[in-house]
């Protein structure tokens, strides 16, 4: 297949077929540079060479009643993670200050659990109001299944984006978790959209799904019209249902990122959890398809040193996208 020609067609408005999507995932490793060249043409058309940086604040760790097979915070997990209740507003603000100083444009407040309590939403809302005033960061909240009134409160507080991943295809969902449904996840994204918050929803690759499952989740996110799509690659943690699972290699991970770009050409594609473990030395190539990364640690696993990420972006000739307040602070 001529990947540059397909890229031009995508830029012109074509939506790729299932056969074309599978061709991306099944493409020969020898053609991977041509595939990524096409993905970069699409990425460059919409985002140039800018990269959005994101940072996670793990606001509540562990104690989750859900049985998600990939997650060390699940009630079914025996992984020896640090567990703590919802942190204070002051701790959230301290994290936002670090994000601002490290040129992170999007600050992600993430909490374990099925869904937030009224107190949790109040703490986040109060913190967000101050974050917007002091630092001007884009704020993404990820607090689980969300109710209408909670979404409205977060919107009024200034939350820009809400993350709730679909994680996998509808067909494969029951293999990953049984304590909530695929429809529960879709409904939360729809609630977020209804209340004017930008929807962020993505996938976890490497959970014993088929290639067709990967195509289906990429298309589902296209149909859901998620503005931001985090693509995670399973970092199998001992003590979870999926411990020992290692179905990925760096070349396949690049093909997955390319698929998400061809399928969702204008969206923010973020290389997320498992980037360092699964992409390895091919990490830089991922940014020819994606235009966003997490900097620093993830929820219960360590990420690459921030300085290594900054050096990687510099070596690639890419530019960090700053907020207006960061432009004023660092570029004046």
Swiss-Prot record:
Identify the EC number(s). 2.8.1.6
Q: Which reaction does it catalyse?
A: (4R,5S)-dethiobiotin + (sulfur carrier)-SH + 2 reduced [2Fe-2S]-[ferredoxin] + 2 S-adenosyl-L-methionine = (sulfur carrier)-H + biotin + 2 5'-deoxyadenosine + 2 L-methionine + 2 oxidized [2Fe-2S]-[ferredoxin]
Which amino acids does the record list as binding [4Fe-4S] cluster?
64, 68, 71
Disulfide pairs here are none
Biological or metabolic pathway of the protein: Cofactor biosynthesis; biotin biosynthesis; biotin from 7,8-diaminononanoate: step 2/2
Instruction: Provide this UniProt record's keywords sorted from A to Z.
Output: 2Fe-2S, 4Fe-4S, Biotin biosynthesis, Iron, Iron-sulfur, Metal-binding, S-adenosyl-L-methionine, Transferase
Q: Name one Pfam family in it.
A: BATS
Radical SAM core domain sequence ranges: 46-275
Is Ion transport set as a keyword in this record? no
The record's annotation in Gene3D superfamilies points to: Aldolase class I
* SUPFAM superfamilies xref list: Radical SAM enzymes
Q: Tell me yes or no: is Membrane among this UniProt entry's keywords.
A: no
Q: What class of enzyme is it?
A: transferase
Query: Which PROSITE patterns would you find in this protein's record?
Result: RADICAL_SAM
Binding site residues for [2Fe-2S] cluster: 108, 140, 200, 270
Query: InterPro entries, alphabetically?
Result: Aldolase_TIM, BATS_dom, Biotin_synth/BioAB, Biotin_synthase, Elp3/MiaA/NifB-like_rSAM, rSAM
Top-level lineage group? Bacteria
Cofactor(s), names only, from the UniProt record: [4Fe-4S] cluster; [2Fe-2S] cluster
Q: Which family does it belong to?
A: Belongs to the radical SAM superfamily. Biotin synthase family.
The protein's assembly and partners:
Homodimer.
- The entry's protein name is Biotin synthase
